[in-house]
Swiss-Prot record:
CDD domains named among the record's database cross-references: M48B_HtpX_like (cd07335)
Subcellular location, record wording: Cell inner membrane
Transmembrane segments: 4-24, 36-56, 151-171, 199-219
Topology relative to the membrane: Multi-pass membrane protein
Protein name: Protease HtpX
Single GO cellular component term: plasma membrane
Source organism (scientific name): Aliivibrio salmonicida (strain LFI1238) (Vibrio salmonicida (strain LFI1238))
Superkingdom per UniProt: Bacteria
UniProt cross-references to Pfam families, sorted A to Z: Peptidase_M48
Active-site residues per Swiss-Prot or TrEMBL entry: E144
Residues at which Zn(2+) binds: H143, H147, E225
Length: 291
């Protein structure tokens, strides 16, 4: 419930800000709300713009949000092993050496992010390093490296941009029709009443459509997890990957949020699997056993 409430609150804030900004853009540019071509252009700009900016800033934002410390020069045997393992796996899949970081957290987790395959980040929690064997940790790293090699961050960004565009376009097209209908029925309210109707309806629809669209993006995220698991199995062997997932079943729920959670090794539980960024661990383990 906490995750769903946070999702709704975040989307509400984003949609309200978007509505205000887009209405200002309409006023400045003179584009009519009823112009479908103009609305589509604005929907594409805002729909893809936010996703692309988030992707480009993902490394810095991720490090700041978890308090991650980048390993510039390994200071101990664990950091040496971590750097060497990521470097070897990156060479195996043909990507540039990712930036490697460690963040302080009791949960066993790791995540990957970055705008390009050759300019990415792999971050590992202290809980994972302290509680997993080297074989298990190696499998987790292989999972994250596979996410990078598969281009999952870029693909997810493009998909989110398309989803955002449709959400914005459809909600505002419907809001425009509703405001036009009510303004004809209630001429006494004038332009102010029509604008408020448009603003309220578009905001509510953007929140509702955004929530429904999250089912699609979460499905895609779960789908990519199976591919990352399979990629890790190819790199280090499926027995190590299964052992890592078995270990995760004994750990606590992931503390990662947002896009980092989507590309972490372990996701959060939800009231329904449809709202989970990761498949249940049992399904992932069974899929690996069938390889």
């Amino acid at each position: 419930m906490k995750r769903i409430a946070l999702f709704l609150a975040t989307n509400l804030a984003v949609m309200i800000v978007f509505s205000i900004v887009l209405n200002i853009v309409y006023a400045v540019t003179g584009i009519q709300q009823g112009s479908l071509s103009g609305l589509l252009v604005m929907a594409v700009l805002f729909g893809f713009g936010g996703s692309l900016v988030s992707l480009l800033m993902s490394k810095k934002m991720a490090l700041r949000s978890v308090g991650g410390e980048v390993i510039e020069q390994p200071r101990n045997e664990t950091e040496h092993w971590l750097m060497e393992t990521v470097s070897r796996q990156a060479q195996q899949v043909g990507i540039g050496m990712p930036t490697v970081a460690i963040y302080d957290s009791p949960d066993m987790n790791a995540f990957a992010t970055g705008a390009k395959r050759d300019d990415s980040l792999v971050a590992v929690s202290t809980g994972l390093l302290h509680n997993m064997t080297r074989d298990e940790a190696e499998a987790v790293l292989a999972h994250e490296v596979s996410h990078i090699a598969n281009g999952d961050m870029i693909t997810m960004t493009l998909m989110q941009g398309v989803v955002n565009t449709f959400v914005i376009f459809l909600s505002r097209m419907i809001a425009n029709a509703v405001s036009g209908f009510t303004s004809n029925d209630e001429e006494g309210e004038g332009e102010g009443g029509s604008f408020m109707t448009y603003f309220i309806v578009s905001t509510v629809l953007e929140i509702a459509f955004g929530f429904l669209a999250s089912f699609l993006t979460m499905w895609f995220s779960r789908h990519r997890e199976f591919y990352a698991d399979a990629g890790a199995a190819n790199l280090v062997g499926k027995d190590k990957m299964i052992a890592a997932l078995e270990r995760l079943r004994m750990g606590q729920e992931s503390q990662l949020e947002g896009s980092m959670m989507a590309f972490g090794i372990n996701g959060k539980k939800s009231l329904t699997e449809l709202l989970m960024s990761h498949p249940p661990l049992e399904k992932r383990i069974n899929a690996l056993r069938q390889l």
